[in-house]
A protein has these predicted regions:
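A cross-family phosphate/adenosyl-ligand binding-site feature
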Residues: 1-119, 125-402
């Protein structure tokens, strides 16, 4: 994530979830953003301003009339400088103030003066959140252009269980990144991505699978989301959901095949990063297979060739990207697969190369199309995903010029 040159104003209000916000401030500052933190006085009861000052290297402002802080009309200069405001956690009280234009502290004053994108993450007791007054106030904020980040559900600090939890740090950071990090050059595109390994059952207890974690597919989904695409992620992974992305679960190759047919054929791009089984048990035992002396033989049968089917039925607008996991003859085998299955691009990687393959956060790949072969050095899967998105965008642009 690269937010260099961006100014972000974080508004922290008086809820217990304020303790989570140092992680968000640190992540944004680490990404290069100039982070300024505004706190309500009640917020300082939960966490001290010094924490944010240490993490951001900027003065944390609480009092609108702080005479020890030299700033050119602070609320105006901060409002003008901000590329984005994130108010999290946002209490029912502050949400009500903002919805009705009240500006009685530095946070609400800067928010009222700012013209940048504004994100609000409600965090409160379930009954307070579901109160019609709070819901009307949130709708009012949306009417005025605020983006309301949906609350999570679970055990709350008050002991109740329900909605009202502040979303995880990564979700808040993704909302910021979607607004600021990239040109929205995939706006209007529908992209379908598959991720994770298939699980082919042998009996009610066991199944055949592989080492795929889904990290590469999730990185591609996130990259396309950040660039403005409408993304559907077909997944067997238990990784956290990607914000703004439609999640469609699958387990077996047959379920993935049906999900591809249902979601991908009217898309602009299909990126098949899932590790799909080539074989499955021909018969699934109705009861657990018991251990006994001697060998156990399981008859296998071929699964459907999903990419092969897509290649045969591919509509003109659909860009198809597959993955090739090899241990030798990487380029030759991957290029042959590209042509055989009528793909537009194949991402080839050798699982024997250190830092590549399953379960790690990095990859070493070669992007192969009909006209070029680009070898990428060891880098994060997020960076690889951006390179894949680059090829999708460039291919679409070339087609539009014809």
């Amino acid at each position: 994530m690269n937010l260099k040159g961006k100014t972000i104003v974080l508004g922290i209000t008086g809820g217990i979830a304020a303790y989570k916000m140092p992680n968000v401030a640190h992540a944004l500052a680490k990404a290069g953003a100039n982070v300024h933190v505004l706190m309500t006085k009640n917020a300082t009861e939960f966490i001290t301003p010094l924490v944010f000052e240490t993490l951001t290297n900027n003065r944390c402002i609480v009092d609108t009339f702080d005479r020890n802080f030299q700033y050119d009309v602070a609320h105006v200069s901060l409002a003008n400088a901000a590329d984005l405001m994130l108010i999290a956690p946002a209490t029912a009280n502050v949400i009500a103030k903002l919805a009705h234009g009240l500006a009685d502290d530095m946070l609400t004053t800067v928010t009222l003066a700012a013209r940048c994108p504004k994100l609000v993450a409600p965090a409160m007791n379930t009954h307070m959140l579901e109160n019609p007054i709070t819901q009307d106030n949130l709708k009012t904020l949306e009417h005025y252009g605020f983006t309301v980040i949906p609350s999570g559900s679970g055990l709350l600090a008050c002991g109740d269980t329900g909605s009202g939890r502040l979303p995880d740090d990564g979700v808040l950071v993704d909302y910021v990144a979607r607004e600021l990090e990239h040109e929205k050059d995939m706006q209007g595109m529908k992209v379908v991505v598959s991720a994770g390994g298939t699980r082919e059952p042998m009996d009610p207890v066991r199944y055949l699978t592989n080492h795929s974690t889904g990290k590469m597919g999730y990185a591609v989904a996130r990259a396309c989301m950040l660039r403005g695409a409408d993304v559907t992620l077909l997944t067997s992974s238990d990784l956290p959901p990607v914000p703004f992305v439609k999640m469609v679960p699958f387990a077996t190759a047959a379920e993935l095949f049906e999900a591809v047919k249902a979601n991908a054929m009217d898309a602009d791009a299909l990126v098949m990063a899932a590790a799909v089984a080539d074989y499955r048990p021909a018969q699934v035992a109705q009861d657990k297979i018991k251990k006994h002396d001697g060998e156990l033989s399981i008859e296998l049968e071929r699964t459907d060739d999903i990419l092969g089917w897509v290649g045969e039925h591919k509509p003109e607008q659909l860009f198809v990207c597959g993955f090739s996991m090899e241990t030798k003859d990487l380029i030759e085998n991957s290029t042959a697969k590209l042509h055989k299955k009528n793909m537009d691009m194949i991402v080839a990687n050798n699982v024997k190369v250190p830092g590549a393959g399953f379960g790690v956060d990095t990859n070493v790949v070669t992007l192969i199309t009909e006209s070029i072969s680009t070898a990428l050095p060891l880098q994060s899967k997020d960076d690889v995903a951006m390179h894949i998105a680059d090829v999708i965008v460039e291919t679409k642009r070339r087609k539009q010029k014809k």
